[in-house]
């Protein structure tokens, strides 16, 4: 299990615990005060044997407890069931056919209550937020495609529908286009998808008159929308780039045949020029600047730079440690496999003789600060962004695997105040929001789909999303670390007040990711058990923190959070793990293919969730940040936190501060 997934499991389990046990200052209701207590657990010790890395498990198994995996059973909403005979809900027998027929998706003129006779979609095809109490169920705005289709035929059906103008309005056509572009990879690989599009256009050239023109317009519209959506991703898919270029040349040759498409073909020309397609191997690639990841060398000039999106071909620097804690620094592609990384290590170590034998003798291990060790398989790739906050890569032989120990803690108790005591809450909150907005903007909307649906499609890197999840974990541990490293009781109380103020300003900035992370950090069991410290907190701050806990309460499918975010207007930063949970609910609540036929409802629901993410980023973020003398210093501090992520160590610090607190 990856460290970021452990974080999701740990934090959501902790939130669930508040529904049963309240901490100091807790009031009646689902949630108490600053979280429930807990014994020194978590963190885990060294593994007993070589354990292969389990990459990217299903999020529904990670976001525990059960209410994060199962649909809510609110009054009037029934959980997904199977009809008699074992047929999945949403599939019925077509009269006279003897086979299944997909549930017809008729246009619903307006929201109607359950039981009113209005056709409703299967609950299993909705994300968990769509099943929130009081929210009407609605079918897609476009009419059914007709007979059920297999993956290889669905694209032609959509193109024929667009060419025939059978959609009811232009907005329905736009949604239909967006649905198929965003979700085609769930049932058809991108390269195959483009091949089908290419073939459809070639066949359309043999059709004369308005019908042929309509087909070409449909093909061009789909290609334009595809390029708009996939900008920045196609450089990793060389095969797709070649097909696009071939189709582009065919379209440009046909431009003289129909003047009506001149504007669209001009736009296509501009898009093809701007889309970053993969450079052929025979050409000389341009020199690339090495991009910094989190916590790499802690260079001020690197952390102050505006974050840009990572792609698999980007190069980074990374340290790989030896069992004696010496290290070599390698330069590697972000998407490099474990075998490639070990090859670079052996080259650095100057293992010139018997290279094959030497490389096979080395293994790559991820070692967490808790001592947990995970053996990385040679075929694994993109391992750099899957590491935990204070995890490191070790290269060793199998004989020395058991002797591996984590590096010494990088965060030490130092005399005097740390940086957090010297900065203003507003400055910290604004810099948190600004940095997290940069990271959120770097995440391509399709990374959310790829992260959850990786089992049904070809692999594509999700490095930017993984880094954003790591950052959420980092902020949570930063809050706990700063509180537990403060030995003076009075200053600890001031820190609690400061973090509550930071959470309030982040909420005001509509940065719900930072807000959640700070609240969860204060709810860390090692912090919430400090009863004497919490008792000294002024009542005004206790009440404010109770409200914040209520907002992060997972009761009733995170109802409080969903109500708050539904009233916000962009720009805003959502709590990203909850989006992944909703997508996982969609993924596991209904099949993508039933008897080989594509579940259109599921595709539309997934696309709706992606469009929600798109809406959050539809406007630029504008923060009023004064250029104070300490502006750059605060910015650097916020972007390179030094934290303790070993829960056992956090509990040790907590018991040193208050040994008898419960």
From Swiss-Prot:
Composition bias type Gly residues, residue spans: 20-48
Query: Which keywords fit this entry according to its UniProt record?
Result: Guanine-nucleotide releasing factor
**Domain Ras-GEF, chain residue ranges per copy:** 424-660
Cite the Pfam families for this sequence: RasGEF
**What are the boundaries of the signal sequence?**
none
UniProt-listed InterPro entries: Ras-like_GEF, Ras_GEF_dom_sf, RASGEF_cat_dom, RASGEF_cat_dom_sf, Ubiquitin-like_domsf
Disordered: annotated span = 1-149
Specify residue ranges for compositional bias: Low complexity: 49-65, 116-133
Question: GO molecular function of the protein, one example?
Answer: guanyl-nucleotide exchange factor activity
User: For this chain's UniProt record, which GO biological process terms are given?
Assistant: small GTPase-mediated signal transduction
Highest taxon of the source?
Answer: Eukaryota
Q: What does this protein do?
A: Probable guanine nucleotide exchange factor (GEF).
This protein's name: Rap guanine nucleotide exchange factor-like 1
- Which taxonomic lineage does the organism of this UniProt entry have? Eukaryota, Metazoa, Chordata, Craniata, Vertebrata
């Amino acid at each position: 299990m990856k460290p970021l997934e452990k974080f999701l499991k740990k934090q959501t389990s902790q939130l669930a615990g508040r529904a049963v046990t309240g901490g100091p200052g807790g009031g009646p209701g689902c949630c108490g005060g600053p979280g429930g207590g807990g014994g020194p657990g978590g963190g885990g010790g060294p593994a007993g044997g070589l354990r292969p890395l389990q990459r990217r498990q299903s999020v529904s198994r990670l976001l525990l407890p059960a209410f994060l995996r199962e649909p809510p059973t609110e009054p009037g909403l029934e959980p997904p069931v199977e009809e008699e005979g074992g047929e999945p809900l949403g599939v019925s027998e077509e009269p006279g056919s003897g086979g299944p027929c997909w549930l017809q998706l008729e246009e619903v003129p307006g929201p109607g209550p359950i039981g009113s006779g209005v056709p409703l979609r299967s609950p299993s095809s909705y994300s968990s937020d769509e099943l929130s109490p009081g929210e009407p169920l609605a079918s897609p705005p476009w009419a059914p495609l007709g007979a059920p289709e297999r993956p290889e035929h669905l694209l032609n059906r959509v193109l024929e529908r667009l060419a025939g103008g059978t959609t009811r309005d232009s907005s329905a056509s736009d949604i239909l286009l967006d649905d198929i572009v965003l979700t085609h990879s769930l049932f058809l690989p991108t390269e195959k998808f483009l091949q089908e599009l290419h073939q459809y256009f070639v066949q359309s050239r043999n059709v004369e008159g308005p019908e042929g023109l309509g087909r070409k317009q449909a093909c061009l519209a789909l290609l334009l929308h595809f390029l708009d959506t996939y900008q920045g991703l196609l450089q990793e898919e060389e095969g797709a780039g070649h097909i696009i270029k071939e189709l582009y040349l065919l379209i440009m040759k046909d431009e003289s045949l129909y003047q009506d498409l001149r504007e669209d073909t001009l736009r296509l020309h501009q898009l093809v020029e701007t889309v970053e397609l993969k450079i052929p191997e025979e050409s000389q690639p341009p020199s690339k600047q090495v991009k910094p990841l989190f916590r790499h060398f802690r260079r001020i000039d690197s952390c102050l730079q505006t974050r840009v999106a990572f792609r698999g071909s980007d190069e980074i620097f990374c340290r790989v440690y030896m069992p004696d804690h010496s290290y070599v620094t390698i330069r590697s592609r972000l998407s490099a496999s474990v075998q490639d990384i070990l090859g670079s290590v052996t080259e650095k170590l100057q293992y010139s003789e018997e290279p094959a034998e030497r490389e096979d003798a080395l293994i790559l291990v991820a070692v967490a600060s808790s001592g947990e060790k995970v053996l990385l398989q040679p075929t694994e790739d993109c391992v750099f962004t899957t590491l935990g906050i204070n995890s490191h890569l070790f290269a060793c032989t199998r004989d020395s695997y058991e002797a591996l120990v984590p590096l010494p803690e990088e965060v030490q108790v130092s005399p005097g105040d740390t940086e957090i005591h010297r900065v203003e809450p507003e400055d910290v909150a604004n810099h948190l929001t600004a940095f997290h907005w940069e990271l959120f903007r770097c995440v391509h909307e399709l990374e959310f789909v790829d992260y959850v649906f990786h089992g049904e499609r070809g692999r594509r890197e999700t490095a930017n999303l993984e880094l954003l999840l790591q950052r959420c974990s980092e902020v949570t541990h930063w809050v706990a670390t700063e509180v537990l490293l403060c030995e003076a009781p009075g200053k600890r109380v001031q820190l609690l007040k400061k973090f509550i103020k930071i959470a309030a300003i982040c909420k005001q900035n509509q940065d719900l990711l930072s807000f959640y992370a700070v609240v969860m950090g204060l709810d860390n069991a090692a912090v919430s058990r400090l009863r004497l410290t919490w008792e000294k907190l002024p009542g005004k701050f206790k009440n404010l923190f109770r409200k914040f806990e209520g907002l992060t309460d997972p009761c009733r499918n995170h109802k409080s959070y969903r109500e708050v975010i539904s009233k916000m207007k962009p720009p805003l930063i959502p709590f990203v793990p909850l989006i992944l949970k909703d997508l996982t609910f969609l993924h596991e609540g209904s099949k993508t293919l039933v008897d080989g036929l594509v579940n259109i409802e599921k595709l539309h629901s997934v696309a709706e969730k992606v469009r929600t993410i798109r809406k959050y980023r539809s406007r630029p973020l504008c923060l009023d940040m004064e250029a104070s003398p300490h502006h750059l210093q605060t910015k650097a501090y916020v972007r390179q936190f030094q934290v303790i992520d070993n829960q056992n160590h956090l509990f040790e610090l907590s018991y040193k501060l208050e040994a008898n607190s419960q």
